[in-house]
Amino acid sequence: MQILLANAKMMTAASDTAPLTEPGFQTIADTLALEMAAMDTEELERQLDCSKKLAAENWGRYQNFFTAAKIPAILAYNGQAYKHLRAQSLTTEDLEFAQKHLWITCFLYGLLRPMDGIVPYRMEHCATLQSTHNRPINQFWKDKLTDFLI
């Protein structure tokens, strides 16, 4: 059995948990992050459909994307599903099970396992980038993830 869980917009900044695994689509995430890092805050505000304050925060995140400390995906997100999951309280055995059976979908990394190391980010489904051939990011990932999961 495999479980898919969507990401959350709210993220946690740090964690001491290790060891981390590498996301399967890390190379694509790096390419997308580089393109986002090249944008100014006004363009980020438009692409992320967010406030100036959130655009500025995420501009900083993308500037530090390659140097920021990585945290396990299961601990990085802070939305309702993750609060109820209480990942901080999972045992090593629970995390090993989750690593084999849980996938987290997101618009930057595509598909994550719980212990994949990621950095805080924001990416919206409607963002259109040159890297995605000017298609909305959700359409870009749809083809890749469908092929991967089926």
Question: Residue spans of the language-model regions?
Answer:
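Internal, well-folded beta-alpha domain core
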Residues: 87-150
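Active-site helix-to-loop segments that bind/position phosphate- or nucleotide-bearing substrates
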Residues: 2-89
